[in-house]
C-alpha cells in the first residue's frame, strides 16, 4: 500500500505574490521532470510491469504515480532551499523562475541556480527556457513588472470554445475557467448555473441562464483583464459580497491612476 506524501504543492498565486518588485526574469525548465528521482533499491521490484518483450522494472520515478508531484516538489525545495531563501527564486515542480530588480542581480542569481543544476546532474530544456526578460510566461500567466495577465495563447482556445453539449463539456470549460477565476469579478455568481449542471442527479437542461453564464465568462476572458501585484507598503481595501449560494472577496489598492 502506498503511503501518501502529504508535502504540499505551492499555490501558483502564492508564488506570483512574491514578484512585486521584480523587473527582470529568467525562466528555466528541468528536462525529464520526475524521472530525475531514483527509486530506492528496496522498492525497485515493486515497480515491475509486463510487456510483450518481457518483465521490466523502473529505476527512476515515473509519471502518473500518486506521490510523484509531492516527491519531486520536495526534492526541488530541498536541493534549492538556500537559493529559494533569497526571496528571488520560486519553483513549481520542474519550472524555475528567477527574478530581480536589476539585470546584474538577475545574472548572479541565474549563475547560482545553473551551478546547482549542474551539481545535481540535472538538465534543462532549452526551448522552454528564457533569459533576462522583462515579461515572461510562467505557469499559464504572463508576468511583467507589477502585473500579471492571462496567457494569450491559452485565451485563443476560449475564443473558439464551442457551445457545450453535455456535462463533460461543461466540466472541461469550467476547468479552464477555474484556473483564471481570479481575473473574473463575481466568478462564482456568474458560473453558478454551469456548476448546477455538473451536480450528480441533475438533468441536462441548457437554459438561457446557462447560455448567458457561458458567454459572460467567455467574453470576460477574451477581454484579457490585468491584475496588479499587491504592494504591502500601501493601504488595502477589502470588498466582500454574498448571495444565497456564493460568497466573494477582493482586495483592492489604489494606483497612480486612482
Regions found by a protein language model. Give the residues of each.
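Retroelement reverse transcriptase polymerase core
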Residues: 1-258
Amino acid at each position: 500500500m502506498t503511503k501518501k506524501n502529504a508535502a504540499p504543492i505551492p499555490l501558483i498565486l502564492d508564488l506570483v505574490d512574491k514578484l512585486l518588485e521584480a523587473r527582470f526574469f529568467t525562466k528555466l525548465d528541468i528536462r525529464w521532470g520526475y524521472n530525475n528521482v531514483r527509486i530506492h533499491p528496496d522498492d525497485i521490484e515493486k515497480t515491475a510491469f509486463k510487456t510483450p518483450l518481457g518483465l521490466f522494472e523502473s529505476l527512476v520515478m515515473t509519471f502518473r504515480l500518486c506521490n510523484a508531484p509531492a516527491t519531486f516538489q520536495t526534492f526541488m525545495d530541498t536541493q534549492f532551499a538556500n537559493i529559494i531563501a533569497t526571496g528571488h527564486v520560486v519553483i513549481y515542480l520542474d519550472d524555475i523562475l528567477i527574478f530581480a530588480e536589476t539585470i546584474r542581480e538577475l545574472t548572479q542569481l541565474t549563475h547560482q541556480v545553473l551551478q546547482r543544476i549542474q551539481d545535481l546532474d540535472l538538465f534543462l530544456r532549452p526551448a522552454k527556457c528564457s533569459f533576462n526578460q522583462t515579461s515572461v510566461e510562467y505557469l499559464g500567466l504572463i508576468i511583467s513588472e507589477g502585473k500579471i495577465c492571462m496567457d494569450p495563447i491559452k485565451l485563443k482556445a476560449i475564443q473558439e470554445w464551442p457551445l457545450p453539449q453535455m456535462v463533460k463539456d461543461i466540466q472541461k470549460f469550467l476547468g479552464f475557467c477555474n484556473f483564471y477565476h481570479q481575473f473574473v469579478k463575481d466568478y462564482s455568481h456568474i458560473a453558478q448555473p454551469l456548476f448546477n449542471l455538473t451536480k450528480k442527479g441533475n438533468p441536462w437542461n441548457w437554459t438561457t441562464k446557462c447560455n448567458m453564464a457561458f458567454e459572460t465568462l467567455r467574453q470576460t476572458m477574451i477581454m484579457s483583464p490585468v491584475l496588479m501585484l499587491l504592494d504591502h507598503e500601501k493601504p488595502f481595501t477589502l470588498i466582500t459580497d454574498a448571495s444565497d449560494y456564493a460568497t466573494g472577496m477582493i482586495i483592492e489598492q489604489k494606483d497612480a491612476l486612482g
